[in-house]
Every structure is written in C-alpha cells, then in structure tokens.
C-alpha cells in the first residue's frame, strides 16, 4: 500500500500519479497544487514545451481532466492557502472542485485563510495530511478490505 503527497508542482504530480495509476495508491494529498495546467499560462507554456501543441494530449497530465474519467474514486485531500500569490492566476483549485463534484469524485478542498505558498503553510497542516494517509493505509491493511 502506498500514499502520495506533494506541494505546488509536486502536488500536481501527486494528483496526476494518483489519478493515472488506479490501484497503486490508497490516498493522495496535495498542498497548493497546480490542478489545471492546460488552463493557466505557466502550464500552457510547459505542456507546449513537453508535449507540443496537441491540447488533447495535455489532458493526460491535467488533474481536472483526469478526475472526470478516473476509474477509481480515490479520496483526494487538498489544502490551499487563501493568501497564496499564485492562487488565482496559476493554481485555481476551484476548477478541481468543480470537476470532482461533476464526476462524483471524493475531494476535500480546504481553503486556509491567511496562509500563502510557503513552508510554514505546509508545516502547519502536514500532520493532518499524514493522518489522512495513515487512515487510508490502515483501512487497506484491515482484514475486511
């Protein structure tokens, strides 16, 4: 049993890996992740550099698109600082929330007022993410699972 977590671009990676690999992970969490790289300037630039101009190919690396067609309903936990300087222009967690609701995919999105994109934000809530993963891993290890 495995769990995966990350921050910012690493949060994007955690979400994408969790959603693209059904059965590999028991839980996924992210701090301030990039959730829709195909819909933000930084992501468009990066996806073009790596994958070319085929926007359809980009969907395989976009958590908002992946959550719509995920075969496994892996619970997702996302914490986002309300004062993050990248919130509106690059991160846009509301897009993931909308996609998850539309797909019936479990997502707990917690907006944290007063927090930014920093280490202090992660340090403030990492214990809750560890508990999230521990609960999922424990449930997977129980004989009734």
Protein language model annotation of sequence segments:
Residues 1-145:
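Non-catalytic cap/lid and distal C-terminal segments of serine-dependent acyl enzymes
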């Amino acid at each position: 049993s495995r769990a995966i977590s990350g921050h910012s671009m690493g949060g994007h990676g955690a979400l994408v890996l969790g959603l693209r690999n059904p059965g590999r992970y028991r839980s996924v969490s992210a701090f301030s992740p990039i959730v829709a790289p195909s819909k933000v300037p930084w992501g468009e630039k990066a996806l073009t550099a790596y994958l070319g101009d085929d926007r359809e190919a980009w969907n395989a690396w976009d958590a908002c698109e992946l959550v719509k067609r995920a075969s496994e309903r892996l619970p997702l936990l996302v914490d986002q600082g309300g004062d993050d300087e990248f919130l509106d222009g690059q991160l846009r967690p509301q897009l993931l929330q909308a996609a998850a609701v539309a797909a019936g995919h479990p997502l707990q999105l917690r907006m944290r007022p007063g927090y930014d994109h920093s280490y202090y934000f992660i340090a403030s809530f990492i214990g809750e993410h560890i508990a999230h993963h521990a609960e999922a891993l424990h449930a997977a290890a129980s004989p009734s699972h």
